[in-house]
């Protein structure tokens, strides 16, 4: 009985710590204007059609000026929210984050910021320039892994070619990127990520010549689906993004932030015509927002509570950032609650086992199955199927 009461108390304390603190902390990592935050709240309050949220929100940005590289304006990597200037990537992220937040019942600006982070960053939080998902293949893989998007491939006779990325454009052209230029360590990090991800098949796409087919021939593609334009340019995967719109002519069109039109538009020409004017465009890969993106993303997640100053938490933090099954929560700024947490931790039976082995780091793992762990090793003993590497883990900073 004591143990059950203790575990319940532990959950209650940590929940109260994180609920308000997470939202306060998230805004510290954001750059935005009051006008943009107010507009996000207004958009979330609107009655978007259920199932049609993506195209609904995409059309809210028609006419917004096209401006490239708006995420490169801060030397310190933070979540930049800018609804007044968009390029193809920021339009896609902005719209999908609004639609996902709406589907999850989110109403606050902080809810939107949290969702946008899930799309934009490896591990779901900004942690330096390299944490941003710069290539489309990285971005899409992360979104699928986190349950935000699903790949659409339909009948193989239409989705006939597999996209196998071979990206190296950024590391080979670092001088074109202000936040990479003259930063060899950062360039090396990008190059390592490029090498690590290359060769992993992303999914099947529709060849350019089939994009002019009608709705009956391409029933898998729906209004509001995300379209990535696959390119044959060396070192790149996709050259442009937009949203699918079935026109009155029965053909696919593209809603996109256009550098040609200098604003967000629904292209009057068909997607087939659009692609034919860009010889490097060889097809389209299609993704769709999942029905319950944030619920899917947070399903079966283990909360990981750490101290930012904890010297033994390197392995824990690294794991939580890389694996979407973990939600990392920093206790560092909440000393009073931390003291209460430590008192409970020190008397918890599960902690006695860890303490006896000499591992007494701060981390605490709270799983949805109700189990409590105080080290990576202890966590993986309880959840052997979750272990990503099959190796023993510890809190000595050496990782697992």
Language-model segments: what does each one mean?
Residues 7-16:
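Bacterial N-terminal signal peptides
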Residues 65-201, 250, 255-259:
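Acidic/His-rich structured neighborhood in mature extracellular/periplasmic domains
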Residues 225-293:
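C-terminal soluble interaction/assembly domains
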Residues 300-329:
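Local sequence-structure signature of Cys/Sec-based thiol-disulfide redox active-site neighborhoods
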Residues 326-347:
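Thiol-based oxidoreductase modules, predominantly thioredoxin-like and allied folds used
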Residues 342-371:
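Short, structured active-site "lid" loops
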Residues 357-361, 372-400:
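Non-globular targeting/processing and membrane-anchoring segments
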